[in-house]
Amino acid sequence: MKVRASLKKRTPECKIVRRNGRLYVINKKNPKYKQRQG
């Protein structure tokens, strides 16, 4: 998982989700795009 200052959807399958007050990008098809806002 990458920690980034600003999240971007890198593919159309990416979803932005808020968990515990943090923003995450999840991608079921290609998990290498997982990100968290730091």
UniProtKB/Swiss-Prot annotation:
InterPro entries for this protein: Ribosomal_bL36, Ribosomal_bL36_sp, Ribosomal_L36_bact
Any GO BP: translation
SUPFAM superfamilies reported in the protein's UniProt record: Ribosomal protein L36 (SSF57840)
GO molecular function, one term: structural constituent of ribosome
Pfam families named in the record: Ribosomal_L36
Assigned keywords, A-Z: Ribonucleoprotein, Ribosomal protein
GO cellular component assignments: ribonucleoprotein complex; ribosome
UniProt similarity note: Belongs to the bacterial ribosomal protein bL36 family.
Official protein name in the record: Large ribosomal subunit protein bL36
Species this chain originates from: Bacteroides fragilis (strain ATCC 25285 / DSM 2151 / CCUG 4856 / JCM 11019 / LMG 10263 / NCTC 9343 / Onslow / VPI 2553 / EN-2)
Gene giving rise to this polypeptide: rpmJ
